[in-house]
Amino acid sequence: MLRELSVLLLVAVCAAKHVELPAPFKDHCILDDKQNLYDPSKQFDIKWYDVNLDLPPSERWVQIATANKEHIADLIGVLINLITPWFPNAIDFVDDVFGDLAPKLAQPYRDEIFSIANATGIPLGQITMYNIFYEIFTVCTSVIAQDKDGHVFHARNLDFGLFMGWDPVLHDWQISQKLRKMIINVNWLKDGKLLYKSNNFAGYIGIYNGLKPNAFSLTADDRFQLVGGYYGILKWVFGLEADGKWMSWLARETLETKTTYLDAKEHLMNTPMLSPVYFILGGSKKDEGCIIARSLDKTALLTEMATSPHGWYLLETNYDQGTEDLYLDDRDTPGFRCMDKLTQKNVGFEGIFNVLSSRTNLNKLTTYTVLMSVETSRFETILQSCPGECYPW
């Protein structure tokens, strides 16, 4: 299937800005069918846990790690099995190199990762690798939109597992299959109170999506650059930037320490980091929404909702705003088309979920959709997949 699809796309690309995919893989907005796939009860399929920041770092993740240790071990095992044919000594390399580097991690992440390794019985190097490999290649769609009354909604699909083991029986990516079993929601507590919310893969201590009540919401999408996540990992592995900030740790730091939309924006725009990223930031007030396109040491591009060409929404996949997507990976065009069909009067959890449940923003890599409202502190994670003949990414 993948071979025939690739040939068709290669033939079509010569003069096309947006390549219409061949049936049955073509883009499709379910709003055209007057479908509603949003079922709020599905949020309860995802379990909630507490991470208490008042506890020592060595104690914060023990419950989560213990409850999910089989899933964590299974995922890491699949990862190593995928790497081993190309790198026969992969497991020794991971155990030795990442194990030796773990003590050099910044606190509190160092103690948290050590405790997860202890609670699961999984070697320290493997838990360390698990906590940074999301920095390399995560393809996603994030949306910030406001309704006619200026209420802001923030959502994203998280797509992960590209080229990580195609399952010819289930027609799905092996890593994506494993990750769907590991999705959790987290209440982060401080001084006995809720500080912020996130969803995570069990045992992963960074943050890709988070909401701080009455302050801001945050998602992070990979930004593919020549000097990208691999470069940051190599710098870290060779000790050139042992205390550097991974993008998911910078997101977590922002949620823990910043109290307003503007403070969070300034911090995300200006803090040096190890991997390029798009930070999509939402607030609780009208027009509070932006896309921060980050390089390693600065902001390359800032796009504000108040000046968006779409007027009432921003949509980010993994390309700079205003640039053309790679023809094999154009999720912007179907996303824009479906958002325009939604219209501003239908903005809300239901409407945006249906946009993100439309192909190809929904694809074989999609593991979940998260929906957030800073104003109401509402945070929902809904498991996603794209069964049948669906585009692989």
Curated annotation (Swiss-Prot):
This protein's pathway: Lipid metabolism; sphingolipid metabolism
Keyword terms, alphabetized: Disulfide bond, Glycoprotein, Hydrolase, Lipid metabolism, Lysosome, Secreted, Signal, Sphingolipid metabolism, Zymogen
Disulfide bond positions: 29-338, 386-390
Modified how: N-glycosylated.
Site (Important for catalytic activity): 159, 318, 331
Glycan-linked positions: 118
Active-site residue list: 140 (nucleophile)
InterPro entries named in the record: Acid_ceramidase-like, Acid_ceramidase_N, CBAH/NAAA_C
Catalytic activity: an N-acyl-sphingoid base + H2O = a sphingoid base + a fatty acid; an N-acylsphing-4-enine + H2O = sphing-4-enine + a fatty acid; an N-acyl-15-methylhexadecasphing-4-enine + H2O = 15-methylhexadecasphing-4-enine + a fatty acid
Compartments (UniProt record): Lysosome; Secreted
Enzyme Commission (EC) number: 3.5.1.23
GO MF entry, a single one: N-acylsphingosine amidohydrolase activity
Listed GO CC annotations: extracellular region; lysosome; membrane
Record-linked Pfam families: CBAH (PF02275), NAAA-beta (PF15508)
This protein's record includes keyword Signal: yes
Keyword Transmembrane: no
GO biological process: fatty acid metabolic process; sphingolipid metabolic process
Signal sequence extent: 1-16
Family: Belongs to the acid ceramidase family.
Quaternary structure, from the entry: Heterodimer; disulfide-linked. The heterodimer is composed of the disulfide-linked alpha and beta chains produced by autocatalytic cleavage of the precursor.
Annotated function: Lysosomal ceramidase that hydrolyzes sphingolipid ceramides into sphingoid base and free fatty acids at acidic pH. C.elegans contain specific sphingoid bases, which are unique or different in structure compared to the sphingoid bases found in other animals. Two examples of these distinctive compounds are: 15-methylhexadecasphinganine and 15-methylhexadecasphing-4-enine.
Name of the molecule in the record: Acid ceramidase
